[in-house]
């Protein structure tokens, strides 16, 4: 039994190919590369889902306005990067967004909708700029549309998660916020 398991493990190791975090736009197309891009970065996933959870905590118009502000400003940041406009501290700002959004969820901060939209919009500017800087061989319009679709889907998942866990009590969403902070800290120290 052990010999068979060892042989299988060795065979699987030899047959394994390198992992690629993002789809090649030349093989899969720019739209699919854009859609897949935010789905393979823990920082992006944590931030996008946290936006949705925070919007669900605020409720009302924030359910759509806060995620919409993020997507809109992310498109602006992407456009700036494609146009060659540099933003300072892009990666630290993305990391700050993960931790900051996690703290907002953990503390269940209730700002007015416009202020909440401004907060996420500022963070989104840096996320969009990072995506524009990672464009590579992809066509800008298709890639941008793809990552905006994926971002909106992650926001939707966050809103659904936030609304769903509300039934279990407000502490559950706050724990998810704390988990986001821990995830952001883990990324910072990795």
Enumerate the predicted regions with their spans:
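Membrane metalloprotein/metal-transporter helix-bundle signature
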Residues: 2-190
């Amino acid at each position: 039994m052990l010999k068979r398991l060892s042989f299988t493990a060795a065979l699987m190791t030899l047959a394994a190919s390198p992992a690629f975090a993002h789809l090649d736009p030349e093989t899969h197309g720019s739209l699919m590369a854009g859609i897949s891009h935010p789905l393979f970065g823990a920082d992006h996933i944590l931030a996008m889902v946290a936006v949705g959870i925070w919007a669900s905590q605020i409720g009302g118009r924030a359910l759509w306005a806060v995620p919409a502000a993020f997507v809109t400003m992310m498109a602006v940041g992407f456009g700036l990067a494609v146009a060659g406009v540099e933003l300072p501290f892009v990666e630290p700002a993305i990391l700050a967004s993960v931790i900051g959004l996690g703290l907002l969820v953990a503390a269940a901060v209730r700002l007015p909708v416009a202020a909440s939209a401004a907060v996420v919009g500022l963070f989104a500017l840096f996320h969009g700029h990072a995506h524009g800087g990672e464009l590579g061989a992809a066509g800008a319009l298709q890639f941008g549309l793809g990552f905006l679709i994926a971002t909106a889907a992650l926001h939707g998942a966050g809103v659904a998660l936030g609304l769903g866990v509300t039934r279990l009590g407000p502490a559950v969403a706050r724990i998810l916020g704390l988990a986001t902070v821990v995830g952001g800290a883990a990324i910072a120290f990795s």
